Amino acid sequence: MSDVKLEQAQYLDKNQYRKLLPGTHLEYFDACEAVEAISPGSYKTLPYTSRVLAEQLVRRCDPETLEDSLKQIIERKSDLDFPWYPARVVCHDILGQTALVDLAGLRDAIADQGGDPAKVNPVVETQLIVDHSLAVEHAGFDSEAFDKNRAIEERRNEDRFHFIEWCKTAFKNVSVIPAGNGIMHQINLEKMSPVIQSKEGIAFPDTCVGTDSHTPHVDALGVIAIGVGGLEAETVMLGRPSMMRLPDIVGVKLTGQRQEGITATDIVLAITEFLRNERVVSSYLEFFGEGARALTIGDRATISNMTPEYGATAGMFYIDEQTIQYLKLTGREPEQVELVERYAKQTGLWADDLDSAQYERVLEFDLSKVERNLAGPSNPHRRLPTRELAEQGISQASWKEQHAKQYSEEQMPDGAVIIAAITSCTNTSNPRNVVAAALVAKKANQLGLVRKPWVKTSFAPGSKVAKLYLESAGLLPELEQLGFGIVGYACTTCNGMSGALDPAIQQEIIDRDLYSIAVLSGNRNFDGRIHPYAKQAFLASPPLVVAYALAGTIRFDIEKDSLGTDNNGKPIYLSDLWPSDAEIDAVVGEHVKPQQFQQIYVKMFQPDEGQVTTEPLYDWRPQSTYIRRPPYWEGALAGERSLSGMRPLAILGDNITTDHLSPSNAILASSAAGEYLTKMEVSEEDFNSYATHRGDHLTAQRATFANPKLFNEMVKDAGEVVQGSLARVEPEGQVTRMWEAIETYMNRKQPLIVVAGADYGQGSSRDWAAKGVRLAGVEVIVAEGFERIHRTNLVGMGVLPLQFKAGTNRNTLELDGTELYDVYGDIEAGSDLALVITRKNGEKLDVPVTCRLDTADEVNVYSAGGVLQRFAKDFLAQ
C-alpha cells in the first residue's frame, strides 16, 4: 500500500457512510453507522442535537479530524473545536443590511489593495427579510393605517431600500423579501425552512443561523436554528465554518396538560422564569415528554421563540406527527412532507427513536400548574401571575378609590396603558393566540365595551396568512372595531417601533408626570425599549392585550375588577369575555387552511425575472445617514491595540442589555444622534429609529450607551448613581453626556475599558452593541459574566472579553472610575490573565481574570483585529 493510501486508511472514510435513502432517489450520510463504528451502542443514547451535529460532521468535516470530532459528541466532551456548517443564513433588514454593508465595504477595501472585489460573495444561501423598519405612526383605529404606515416606511428608508435592492443583484446567493410581507421568523417557520434539505442529490437536516436572537423560533420544527450577531453571520455567509465546542445539552421534560383557558404565552412566560432560575445560559435545550407531544407547532414555536429570554442558545423539539401535520397545514409540497418523515425515521430523528436519548441534566416542568400570566415590568423572566396583581402592588384598591372620579370621566389615570399591541412572531405565528384575541374582541363588542381613548392599539401579524383566516372566520372586523386593525406585517412595537403618541396624550404624560406603560404580546420589555414615554412594559398573551386596552390601566385587577357594565347594568368581567378552548379550536380547525399559506407564499417566493447584474462596488451616497462606507479597515481600527493605560468609560451593574449598549427605539431630537441628524438636514419627523441607521457608523456610534435608562456607577449625586446616558471624563472628573465623553477620549486616542456585573450583553443580537464600543476606543470589557451572542460579537470586533473570578467584582474591588487598567499574560483560549488596576493614589491591585476567547479560532480572530480585518487578509491572500 502506498504512503498516501496508508495515510488515508488511518481516517474514517466519509464516503462509506453515503447511502441511498430508501424510497427516494436521494442519498444521505449515515451518522448512526459512523458513530457506531467508533463506539457501538452510542448513537441511541445521543440527544437530538448531537445526532444532527454528528450528521453534518460526517457530511462536511475534514476526514483527518472527523473521528476526533465525533468522539467529542460521543463522549460528551467540550475540549476540542469542531466545525459547524449551517445550511442557510436568515437576516432581517437591520443586522442583515449592516452585514451586507460590511461586505460592500470589504469589497472596497480589497479593491483599494488591488484585489478583485467581485470575489467577495456569500456562498451560503442568504435570505433577507425586511421586517424591522415599519413604525406604527398610525394606530389600529385608523382604517387606513396599513397604507399610511407603509408609505412612511418607504419614504424614510429610501436609502436603505436602495442599497438592499442593489444587494439582490450585486451579490450571489442573496434573496430578498421586501417590506410589507411579514416577520423573518414567522416566514421561516411557515415557508422557508424545509426541515430536511435536498441539494445536489443529498438529503440532510436543515440548519441555519439568523441575525436575530429569536431565530430559534424554527427549533419548534426540529431545525437547529440559532441567533448570531451580524459578524458571525458574515463568517457563515462567506462559507467559513462556525467553530464550536459541544454545548451543554439539557433535557426539559414537559409533563401534564395545560388547564382550560391557558395560552401558549402563559406557558412560555412560566417556562422562561423557571429556566432562568435553572441557569441554562448558552445551553441547547430539548423539550420532550407527554406534555411536549401534545403541543401544536404554534405552541412549540412560542416556546422556542423565547429561547434567548431564558438564556439558552436553542430550544429544540423532536420531529413527530405534529411536525408533519404542520407542514401539510402550511402548504408544503407533498413530496417534501414525505421526505421529512422518511428521513427522520431512517436516521433516528423521529420522536419515537429518541426515547432512549440520555441527558446529563434533565429538568421537569409541569404544564398543568401554569396559570394566567403577565411578565414585567422590565424583564421577560419576571413572571407576574394575574391572580397576584393586588398582592404584588400592581393593582391597588386605594388607587381606585382615589382616582375613581377622573377615571369615570375618561381622564388618563396614573398607570395608564398608553400602548396595547398585538405584535411579534412569538405570538402571532400561533393561530390559537390570534383567534383567542379576536374572540375576546367579539364578546367585548357584543357587550358594548370600548377601548379607553388614551390607548394606542395595533395589530401587526408576522404573516399575511393571519388576515386570511381571520377574514374567513368573520373575526377581523371584531378586532378592527376595538382599534386592533392591521397596521403592518412587521415587528413594529416588539422591536421598539411603536411610533409617535398622540401629541396631546404625550404632553399630558409630561405635564402630570404620569406613570404610563405598554402591554404587548412581544418577547422583550426592557426599560425604555417600547417607547420613551412608556416607563415600563408588560408582556401578555394577545387576548390579555385586548383586555388591557379595555381596562386602560395597569392599576387594575384584571381577574377581579369589572371592565364595564352591560345594558342591564350588570358588571362585565374578564371571565365573561374569555373564550373556551373548544371555541378557539373550532375556529382554528375550520378556518386555518393550506390554501391560505399557498396563496400568500407562492407569489412571494417567485423568482425575479430579468434581473440585471450591477457593478461590484456600491456607489456610496455621501449625504446618507443610513448607508455609509464602513471604516473598519482604516486608521486606528487597522492598527495596533493597547491593553495598557486604559481608563474606564463606564462601570455598570448586572443585567446590562444590548438595549443599554445601543438602543433601537425612536431617536429624540435632544440626543447626540438627533443633533447629528439635524446637522445633516434630516427633519425630526423623519429621524426614524436608531436601528434603521446602523448602516451609517457616524449616526450609529452616537447611539453607544445612549439609553436614558442607563446607570453608569461612575456618575453619582450625593452618593446615589444618576440615571442617564452619562459619563465622567478622567482625570478631570468632569461629568458629561456619554457621546461627549467618547469624543473627548477619541481625540486623545485614550484606550478604554468597560467594567460590568453579571449577564452582560443580554437581549438582541445586535452587532452594533459591540461595534459602538470598539469605535469608541474600548479595548476590553471585564464582567462577571457574558451572554453568548454579545460575547461573540465583541470578539468579532476585536474587543477582548475578560471575566472576573468567582467572588471578585467591581464592588469587592471598590472601583470608582479614577483607576488605570493594564492587562498582562498570554492571550489564549480560556487562559488566566492579570488585570492590574492602579488607583489614583498609586496603589496597585493584581486581579486574576479569565480570558473569554473560548476557542482557538476566536484567538485568531482577535489577533487579526476582528473578523472583518481577517476577511480582508484572507481575500487578499487568495
Predicted features and spans:
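N-terminal amphipathic, basic-rich helices that act as targeting or association modules
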Residues: 2-152, 295-301, 305, 309-333, ...
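Structural motif
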Residues: 26, 87-89, 126-128, 206-208, ...
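Mobile "lid/hinge" segments at catalytic clefts and subdomain interfaces of large enzymes
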Residues: 49, 180, 196-344, 350, ...
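Long, structured ligand/cofactor-binding scaffold of large enzymes
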Residues: 62-254, 266-269, 372-375, 389-484, ...
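Extracellular/luminal Protease-associated
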Residues: 284, 288-295, 523, 743-787
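Acidic, glycine-rich flexible loop/linker segments
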Residues: 566-580, 587, 790-861, 869
